[in-house]
Design a protein with these regions (language model features):
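PLP-dependent enzyme catalytic core of the Aspartate aminotransferase-like
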Residues: 198, 263-340
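Composition- and surface-driven signal marking solvent-exposed, interaction-prone regions
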Residues: 161, 240-242, 255-257, 288-289, ...
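Conserved small-domain helix->loop->beta segment predominantly found in fold-type I
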Residues: 182, 193, 197-242, 251-268
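Conserved PLP-enzyme active-site core in the AAT-like
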Residues: 1-210, 231, 276, 284
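A common structural junction motif
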Residues: 247-251, 300
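Flexible, glycine/charged-enriched surface loops at secondary-structure junctions
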Residues: 169-172, 189-195, 207-219, 255, ...
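Active-site lining segments that contact anionic ligands and/or coordinate catalytic metals
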Residues: 143-145, 222-226, 246-248, 268-273, ...
């Protein structure tokens, strides 16, 4: 929908490269990315600071200036956000440069929508984004789905891009569940989002103390729900994703900056990505992250038999059988006056 509203086929857009945290939906045609292959956009990558694990503001300003003045082909859209999203992106630092070039700003909040709703991440619309796309089923813990939000000046365009341009129907059966999830975010979101980030930082520290190379140590590892780990000293991400799953520990293999240059492929990259939203929702706190880190270490570093680790994970998990940050009963949900 964002592409339909803000661009035409053949336009230029800026986004993160996938090894730098970008999502396939913003990828180039030659990599089967949605932006290039489906909408026909020419994708230019944001310059990226690998040490800071974020967009390089100064180099981005220089790149946009060159696109405008020398190449005479300014971007029409700048897409912030991604699938590896450790720190808030520099929207407010780049909004003037991007808008001055005649481009619109979109922000992919699929992974961090719950943190934004909880007031613990950046506020992209108020920092200058023209539209925000999001998932309703990640850190925002509702049924699977998505949404695009914006201020009123783009509202009608987004509605028309949604129907009839891109969709003909939506899943009505999920709306009630989403409404309850949104109400729970209003009631519990601040505490929930804060605990997620606290747990992620603690998990990063615990993994670091056990010898794993956790990215962005000098910045406290993360300001989101995600922790990124370079495991090339011991194994590769695709192999360990499978091994950890066999041990009942679910992580994602993750392309990291430098993987492509090193000849690694997205099916077996150099990293893993770990999120803390699910374990937070079942009641885990900062103090439990050392045990979670130990399970991961046993598989990756110690090369313990996943079956044995699985038994220990199951025993540990028995202590967390309740969903937190939610209404205790249907009555609580239906009587929640803030959504009336």
């Amino acid at each position: 929908m964002v592409y339909t509203v803000f661009t035409n086929p053949g336009d230029r857009m800026m986004a993160l490269a996938i090894p730098n945290g970008g999502h396939i939906s913003t990828g180039r045609k030659e990599f089967s990315g949605t932006a290039g292959a489906v909408h026909g956009l020419e994708v230019e990558y944001f310059p990226f600071d690998r040490k800071e694990m974020n967009i390089d503001v100064d180099k981005t300003k220089q790149k946009i200036a060159k696109m405008v003045t020398e190449e005479k082909n300014a971007p029409k859209l700048a897409m912030f956000g991604g699938s590896l999203f450790l720190f808030p992106h520099p929207v407010k630092e780049l909004v003037e440069t991007i808008h001055s070039a005649g481009a619109k700003i979109a922000y992919d909040a699929a992974h961090v929508a719950g943190l934004i709703a909880g007031g613990r991440f950046q506020d992209p619309l108020r920092e200058g984004a023209d539209a925000v796309s999001l998932s309703t089923h990640k850190t925002l813990f509702g049924p699977q789905g998505g949404a695009v939000i914006s201020f009123e000046n783009y509202g009608e365009q987004i509605k028309k891009a949604t129907f009839p341009s891109n969709t003909s129907n939506h899943h009505l059966h999920s709306l009630a569940g989403k409404a309850i999830a949104f109400a729970e975010m209003l009631e519990f979101g601040k505490e929930y989002a804060g605990q997620i980030i606290e747990n992620a930082k603690a998990l990063g520290q615990a993994l670091h103390e056990r010898g794993l190379t956790v990215l962005a140590e000098h910045k406290g590892f993360t300001e989101s729900h995600q922790v990124a780990v370079d495991i090339t000293k011991y194994a590769l991400g695709g192999d360990m994703e499978k091994a950890l799953e066999s041990a009942n520990v679910i992580v994602n293999r993750q392309l990291l900056p430098g993987d492509i240059q090193a000849g690694r492929h997205y099916t077996n990259p150099g990293g893993i990505r770990i999120g803390t939203s699910e374990i937070t929702r079942i009641g885990m706190k900062r103090s439990h992250m050392s045990e979670v880190a130990e399970f991961i270490k046993r598989v990756i570093i110690n090369k313990d038999e996943p079956r044995k680790v699985k038994e220990d994970v199951a025993a540990f998990r028995k202590g967390f059988q309740k969903v937190h940050y939610c209404f205790e009963s249907a009555k609580d949900a239906y009587e929640y006056i803030k959504i009336r």
